[in-house]
Protein backbone atom coordinates (compact mmCIF):
# COMPACT_ATOMS: atom_id res chain seq x y z
CA UNK A 1 0.00 0.00 0.00
CA UNK A 2 1.06 3.54 -0.69
CA UNK A 3 0.83 6.21 2.00
CA UNK A 4 -2.66 7.59 2.44
CA UNK A 5 -3.75 11.02 3.68
CA UNK A 6 -5.47 11.56 6.99
CA UNK A 7 -9.16 10.58 6.73
CA UNK A 8 -8.74 8.42 3.60
CA UNK A 9 -11.77 8.38 1.31
CA UNK A 10 -13.05 5.17 -0.22
CA UNK A 11 -16.13 3.52 -1.68
CA UNK A 12 -17.88 0.44 -0.34
CA UNK A 13 -17.76 -1.52 -3.58
CA UNK A 14 -20.50 -1.30 -6.17
CA UNK A 15 -20.96 1.60 -8.58
CA UNK A 16 -23.58 2.18 -11.29
CA UNK A 17 -22.90 0.30 -14.50
CA UNK A 18 -22.59 2.60 -17.52
CA UNK A 19 -25.72 2.46 -19.69
CA UNK A 20 -23.77 1.06 -22.61
CA UNK A 21 -22.59 -1.88 -20.48
CA UNK A 22 -26.18 -2.72 -19.58
CA UNK A 23 -26.99 -2.68 -23.30
CA UNK A 24 -24.01 -4.93 -24.08
CA UNK A 25 -25.20 -7.44 -21.45
CA UNK A 26 -28.68 -7.41 -23.01
CA UNK A 27 -27.25 -7.98 -26.50
CA UNK A 28 -25.04 -10.81 -25.25
CA UNK A 29 -28.00 -12.57 -23.63
CA UNK A 30 -29.83 -12.25 -26.95
CA UNK A 31 -26.88 -13.83 -28.77
CA UNK A 32 -26.12 -10.68 -30.73
CA UNK A 33 -22.58 -10.07 -29.49
CA UNK A 34 -19.78 -12.50 -28.65
CA UNK A 35 -18.24 -13.40 -25.30
CA UNK A 36 -15.15 -11.49 -26.39
CA UNK A 37 -17.17 -8.36 -27.12
CA UNK A 38 -18.86 -8.60 -23.72
CA UNK A 39 -15.52 -8.92 -21.93
CA UNK A 40 -14.28 -5.84 -23.76
CA UNK A 41 -17.37 -3.98 -22.58
CA UNK A 42 -16.73 -5.09 -18.98
CA UNK A 43 -13.10 -3.97 -19.22
CA UNK A 44 -14.12 -0.60 -20.62
CA UNK A 45 -16.64 -0.22 -17.79
CA UNK A 46 -13.95 -0.85 -15.17
CA UNK A 47 -11.82 1.86 -16.77
CA UNK A 48 -14.81 4.24 -16.75
CA UNK A 49 -15.57 3.55 -13.08
CA UNK A 50 -11.96 4.09 -12.04
CA UNK A 51 -11.93 7.33 -14.02
CA UNK A 52 -15.00 8.51 -12.09
CA UNK A 53 -13.33 7.59 -8.80
CA UNK A 54 -10.13 9.37 -9.86
CA UNK A 55 -11.95 12.51 -10.99
CA UNK A 56 -13.94 12.58 -7.75
CA UNK A 57 -10.69 12.33 -5.78
CA UNK A 58 -11.31 8.98 -4.06
CA UNK A 59 -8.16 7.71 -2.33
CA UNK A 60 -9.05 3.99 -2.28
CA UNK A 61 -11.18 2.98 -5.30
CA UNK A 62 -12.76 -0.27 -6.45
CA UNK A 63 -13.68 -1.54 -9.91
CA UNK A 64 -17.33 -0.88 -9.10
CA UNK A 65 -18.12 -4.62 -9.09
CA UNK A 66 -19.41 -4.06 -12.64
CA UNK A 67 -18.89 -7.72 -13.60
CA UNK A 68 -21.22 -8.91 -10.82
CA UNK A 69 -25.00 -8.95 -11.21
CA UNK A 70 -25.56 -9.50 -7.50
CA UNK A 71 -23.36 -9.97 -4.43
CA UNK A 72 -24.50 -13.49 -3.48
CA UNK A 73 -25.58 -14.87 -6.84
CA UNK A 74 -22.13 -14.19 -8.34
CA UNK A 75 -20.37 -16.42 -5.80
CA UNK A 76 -23.08 -19.08 -5.69
CA UNK A 77 -22.59 -19.55 -9.43
CA UNK A 78 -18.89 -20.25 -8.87
CA UNK A 79 -18.77 -22.30 -5.65
CA UNK A 80 -19.60 -26.00 -5.86
CA UNK A 81 -22.73 -26.99 -3.96
CA UNK A 82 -25.25 -24.41 -5.20
CA UNK A 83 -28.17 -24.72 -7.59
CA UNK A 84 -30.62 -22.16 -8.97
CA UNK A 85 -34.27 -23.10 -9.45
CA UNK A 86 -35.56 -19.72 -10.57
CA UNK A 87 -36.26 -16.17 -9.41
CA UNK A 88 -37.90 -15.37 -6.07
CA UNK A 89 -39.91 -12.20 -5.56
CA UNK A 90 -38.28 -9.95 -2.98
CA UNK A 91 -40.79 -7.09 -2.97
CA UNK A 92 -43.14 -5.52 -5.49
CA UNK A 93 -41.80 -6.35 -8.93
CA UNK A 94 -38.24 -6.98 -7.72
CA UNK A 95 -36.94 -10.53 -8.15
CA UNK A 96 -33.78 -12.25 -6.92
CA UNK A 97 -32.19 -15.47 -8.17
CA UNK A 98 -31.95 -16.97 -4.69
CA UNK A 99 -29.51 -19.90 -4.71
CA UNK A 100 -30.08 -23.23 -2.98
CA UNK A 101 -27.38 -25.31 -1.31
CA UNK A 102 -27.90 -28.86 -2.58
CA UNK A 103 -24.52 -30.52 -1.85
CA UNK A 104 -21.33 -30.00 0.14
CA UNK A 105 -19.72 -26.60 -0.40
CA UNK A 106 -16.37 -26.85 -2.17
CA UNK A 107 -14.02 -24.26 -3.62
CA UNK A 108 -13.49 -24.88 -7.33
CA UNK A 109 -11.19 -22.19 -8.73
CA UNK A 110 -10.39 -18.47 -8.38
CA UNK A 111 -13.46 -16.28 -8.78
CA UNK A 112 -12.12 -12.74 -8.48
CA UNK A 113 -8.46 -12.96 -9.43
CA UNK A 114 -8.96 -12.11 -13.10
CA UNK A 115 -11.17 -9.11 -12.39
CA UNK A 116 -8.75 -7.86 -9.72
CA UNK A 117 -5.74 -8.32 -12.00
CA UNK A 118 -7.36 -6.27 -14.75
CA UNK A 119 -8.48 -3.52 -12.38
CA UNK A 120 -5.00 -3.38 -10.88
CA UNK A 121 -3.49 -2.98 -14.36
CA UNK A 122 -5.61 0.12 -15.11
CA UNK A 123 -5.92 1.64 -11.62
CA UNK A 124 -4.55 5.10 -10.84
CA UNK A 125 -3.32 3.86 -7.44
CA UNK A 126 -2.04 0.66 -5.90
CA UNK A 127 -4.43 1.36 -3.00
CA UNK A 128 -7.10 -0.59 -4.87
CA UNK A 129 -9.73 -2.40 -2.82
CA UNK A 130 -11.30 -5.71 -3.83
CA UNK A 131 -14.55 -6.85 -2.22
CA UNK A 132 -15.89 -10.32 -1.52
CA UNK A 133 -19.17 -11.39 0.06
CA UNK A 134 -18.71 -13.06 3.43
CA UNK A 135 -19.77 -16.59 4.39
CA UNK A 136 -22.62 -15.66 6.71
CA UNK A 137 -24.35 -13.40 4.18
CA UNK A 138 -24.04 -15.97 1.39
CA UNK A 139 -25.67 -18.58 3.64
CA UNK A 140 -28.35 -16.29 5.04
CA UNK A 141 -29.45 -15.21 1.57
CA UNK A 142 -29.60 -18.79 0.24
CA UNK A 143 -31.85 -21.79 0.83
CA UNK A 144 -30.18 -24.61 2.77
CA UNK A 145 -31.31 -27.96 1.38
CA UNK A 146 -28.26 -30.01 2.36
CA UNK A 147 -26.65 -29.11 5.70
CA UNK A 148 -28.19 -30.12 9.02
CA UNK A 149 -27.82 -26.57 10.27
CA UNK A 150 -26.80 -23.15 9.01
CA UNK A 151 -23.66 -23.00 11.14
CA UNK A 152 -22.08 -25.97 9.35
CA UNK A 153 -22.92 -24.37 6.00
CA UNK A 154 -21.41 -21.04 7.01
CA UNK A 155 -18.13 -22.58 8.18
CA UNK A 156 -17.74 -24.55 4.95
CA UNK A 157 -18.35 -21.33 3.05
CA UNK A 158 -15.74 -19.62 5.25
CA UNK A 159 -13.16 -22.20 4.15
CA UNK A 160 -13.98 -21.55 0.49
CA UNK A 161 -13.83 -17.77 0.94
CA UNK A 162 -10.50 -18.14 2.75
CA UNK A 163 -9.00 -19.91 -0.25
CA UNK A 164 -10.25 -17.17 -2.55
CA UNK A 165 -8.86 -14.40 -0.36
CA UNK A 166 -5.46 -16.09 -0.24
CA UNK A 167 -5.47 -16.34 -4.04
CA UNK A 168 -6.23 -12.62 -4.23
CA UNK A 169 -3.29 -11.83 -1.94
CA UNK A 170 -1.05 -13.97 -4.15
CA UNK A 171 -2.28 -11.93 -7.13
CA UNK A 172 -1.23 -8.72 -5.38
CA UNK A 173 -4.32 -7.59 -3.48
CA UNK A 174 -3.40 -5.38 -0.55
CA UNK A 175 -6.83 -4.20 0.65
CA UNK A 176 -9.60 -6.79 0.85
CA UNK A 177 -13.11 -6.09 2.11
CA UNK A 178 -15.45 -8.81 3.35
CA UNK A 179 -19.09 -7.78 2.93
CA UNK A 180 -21.32 -9.06 5.72
CA UNK A 181 -24.56 -7.04 5.61
CA UNK A 182 -26.55 -9.97 7.04
CA UNK A 183 -24.29 -10.66 10.03
CA UNK A 184 -26.24 -8.46 12.45
CA UNK A 185 -29.76 -9.49 11.49
CA UNK A 186 -30.17 -12.51 13.82
CA UNK A 187 -28.98 -12.06 17.39
CA UNK A 188 -28.68 -15.81 18.02
CA UNK A 189 -26.18 -16.25 15.17
CA UNK A 190 -23.84 -13.33 15.77
CA UNK A 191 -21.26 -14.93 18.09
CA UNK A 192 -20.52 -17.88 15.82
CA UNK A 193 -21.00 -15.72 12.72
CA UNK A 194 -18.06 -13.62 13.91
CA UNK A 195 -16.03 -16.82 14.36
CA UNK A 196 -16.86 -17.76 10.76
CA UNK A 197 -15.62 -14.41 9.46
CA UNK A 198 -12.40 -14.97 11.39
CA UNK A 199 -12.09 -18.39 9.75
CA UNK A 200 -12.53 -16.73 6.35
CA UNK A 201 -9.59 -14.37 6.95
CA UNK A 202 -7.35 -16.84 8.81
CA UNK A 203 -3.71 -16.66 7.71
CA UNK A 204 -4.30 -13.74 5.33
CA UNK A 205 -1.56 -11.11 4.99
CA UNK A 206 -3.38 -8.01 3.75
CA UNK A 207 -5.27 -5.02 5.08
CA UNK A 208 -8.63 -6.53 5.97
CA UNK A 209 -11.85 -4.57 6.06
CA UNK A 210 -15.37 -5.71 6.90
CA UNK A 211 -18.55 -3.96 5.79
CA UNK A 212 -21.86 -4.06 7.61
CA UNK A 213 -24.73 -1.73 6.88
CA UNK A 214 -28.47 -2.03 7.48
CA UNK A 215 -29.54 -4.07 10.46
CA UNK A 216 -29.45 -4.05 14.24
CA UNK A 217 -26.00 -2.83 15.31
CA UNK A 218 -26.75 -3.61 18.95
CA UNK A 219 -26.68 -7.33 18.09
CA UNK A 220 -23.12 -7.20 16.78
CA UNK A 221 -21.58 -4.34 18.79
CA UNK A 222 -20.40 -6.55 21.70
CA UNK A 223 -18.46 -8.77 19.27
CA UNK A 224 -16.86 -6.24 16.91
CA UNK A 225 -13.48 -6.17 18.64
CA UNK A 226 -13.25 -9.96 18.29
CA UNK A 227 -13.17 -9.72 14.49
CA UNK A 228 -9.70 -10.35 13.02
CA UNK A 229 -9.92 -7.41 10.64
CA UNK A 230 -8.22 -4.03 10.63
CA UNK A 231 -11.24 -1.92 9.84
CA UNK A 232 -15.04 -2.13 9.91
CA UNK A 233 -17.09 0.28 7.84
CA UNK A 234 -20.64 1.16 8.75
CA UNK A 235 -23.76 2.87 7.45
CA UNK A 236 -24.08 5.96 9.67
CA UNK A 237 -25.76 8.63 7.56
CA UNK A 238 -29.09 6.84 7.30
CA UNK A 239 -29.15 6.42 11.10
CA UNK A 240 -28.25 10.06 11.78
CA UNK A 241 -25.00 8.87 13.40
CA UNK A 242 -26.75 7.35 16.43
CA UNK A 243 -24.60 4.15 16.27
CA UNK A 244 -21.53 6.21 17.24
CA UNK A 245 -22.67 6.25 20.85
CA UNK A 246 -23.17 2.47 20.76
CA UNK A 247 -19.66 1.86 19.40
CA UNK A 248 -18.16 4.14 22.03
CA UNK A 249 -20.05 2.29 24.78
CA UNK A 250 -18.53 -1.03 23.69
CA UNK A 251 -15.02 0.38 23.31
CA UNK A 252 -14.73 -0.16 19.56
CA UNK A 253 -10.98 -0.10 18.91
CA UNK A 254 -10.48 -0.78 15.20
CA UNK A 255 -10.27 1.60 12.28
CA UNK A 256 -13.69 3.06 11.61
CA UNK A 257 -15.09 3.37 8.10
CA UNK A 258 -17.73 6.07 8.54
CA UNK A 259 -20.68 6.19 6.16
CA UNK A 260 -21.46 9.85 5.39
CA UNK A 261 -23.42 9.42 2.13
CA UNK A 262 -26.99 8.09 1.95
CA UNK A 263 -27.00 5.69 -1.00
CA UNK A 264 -30.79 5.29 -1.04
CA UNK A 265 -31.55 8.98 -1.49
CA UNK A 266 -31.00 10.82 -4.77
CA UNK A 267 -30.46 14.08 -2.92
CA UNK A 268 -26.80 15.05 -3.24
CA UNK A 269 -25.20 15.94 0.07
CA UNK A 270 -23.29 19.22 0.13
CA UNK A 271 -19.61 19.27 0.98
CA UNK A 272 -20.35 21.36 4.08
CA UNK A 273 -22.94 18.81 5.21
CA UNK A 274 -20.33 16.08 4.86
CA UNK A 275 -17.78 18.19 6.74
CA UNK A 276 -20.24 18.75 9.59
CA UNK A 277 -20.93 15.02 9.77
CA UNK A 278 -17.21 14.22 9.89
CA UNK A 279 -16.76 16.73 12.72
CA UNK A 280 -19.49 14.86 14.59
CA UNK A 281 -17.68 11.53 14.04
CA UNK A 282 -14.42 13.03 15.33
CA UNK A 283 -16.12 13.79 18.63
CA UNK A 284 -16.08 10.01 19.16
CA UNK A 285 -12.96 8.77 17.33
CA UNK A 286 -9.51 10.17 16.61
CA UNK A 287 -8.87 11.17 12.97
CA UNK A 288 -5.98 8.72 12.63
CA UNK A 289 -8.46 5.84 12.95
CA UNK A 290 -11.24 7.16 10.68
CA UNK A 291 -11.87 6.50 7.00
CA UNK A 292 -14.67 8.20 5.06
CA UNK A 293 -17.06 6.26 2.80
CA UNK A 294 -20.69 6.07 1.65
CA UNK A 295 -23.14 4.04 3.72
CA UNK A 296 -23.15 1.19 1.21
CA UNK A 297 -22.63 0.48 -2.49
CA UNK A 298 -23.77 3.09 -5.00
CA UNK A 299 -25.09 0.82 -7.76
CA UNK A 300 -28.79 1.67 -7.29
CA UNK A 301 -28.21 5.35 -8.06
CA UNK A 302 -27.72 6.91 -11.47
CA UNK A 303 -24.09 7.24 -12.43
CA UNK A 304 -24.35 11.04 -12.47
CA UNK A 305 -25.76 11.23 -8.95
CA UNK A 306 -23.33 8.62 -7.60
CA UNK A 307 -20.41 10.61 -8.98
CA UNK A 308 -21.68 13.91 -7.56
CA UNK A 309 -22.15 12.30 -4.15
CA UNK A 310 -18.53 11.11 -4.22
CA UNK A 311 -17.36 14.61 -5.14
CA UNK A 312 -19.22 16.03 -2.14
CA UNK A 313 -17.78 13.32 0.10
CA UNK A 314 -14.22 14.08 -0.98
CA UNK A 315 -14.61 17.87 -0.85
CA UNK A 316 -16.17 17.72 2.61
CA UNK A 317 -13.30 15.52 3.79
CA UNK A 318 -10.78 18.04 2.44
CA UNK A 319 -12.44 20.81 4.46
CA UNK A 320 -11.96 18.84 7.68
CA UNK A 321 -8.40 17.87 6.74
CA UNK A 322 -7.51 21.55 6.44
CA UNK A 323 -9.04 22.23 9.84
CA UNK A 324 -7.00 19.39 11.33
CA UNK A 325 -3.87 20.66 9.61
CA UNK A 326 -4.30 24.02 11.32
CA UNK A 327 -4.50 22.14 14.62
CA UNK A 328 -1.12 20.53 13.98
CA UNK A 329 -2.10 17.21 12.41
CA UNK A 330 -0.06 15.80 9.52
CA UNK A 331 -2.68 15.30 6.81
CA UNK A 332 -0.64 14.29 3.73
Curated annotation (Swiss-Prot):
One protein family per Pfam: Meth_synt_2
Gene that specifies this protein: metE
Organism: Saccharolobus islandicus (strain L.S.2.15 / Lassen #1) (Sulfolobus islandicus)
Function: Catalyzes the transfer of a methyl group to L-homocysteine resulting in methionine formation. The physiological methyl donor is unknown.
Protein name: Methionine synthase
This protein's record includes keyword Methyltransferase: yes
Any single GO BP term: methylation
Entry keywords, A to Z: Amino-acid biosynthesis, Metal-binding, Methionine biosynthesis, Methyltransferase, Transferase, Zinc
Listed GO MF terms: 5-methyltetrahydropteroyltriglutamate-homocysteine S-methyltransferase activity; zinc ion binding
Similarity comment text for this entry: Belongs to the archaeal MetE family.
E.C. code: 2.1.1.-
Amino acid sequence: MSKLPLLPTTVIGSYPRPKWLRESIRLHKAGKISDEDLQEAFNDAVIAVLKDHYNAGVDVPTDGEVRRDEMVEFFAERIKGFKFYGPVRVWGTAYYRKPSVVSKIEYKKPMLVDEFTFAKSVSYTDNLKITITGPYTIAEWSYNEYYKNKKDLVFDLAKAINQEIKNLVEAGAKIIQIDEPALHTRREDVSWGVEAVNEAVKGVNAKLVMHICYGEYSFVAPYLNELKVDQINFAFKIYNYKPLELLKRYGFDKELGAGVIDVHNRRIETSEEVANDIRKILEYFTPEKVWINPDCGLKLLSRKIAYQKLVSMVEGTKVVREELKRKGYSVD
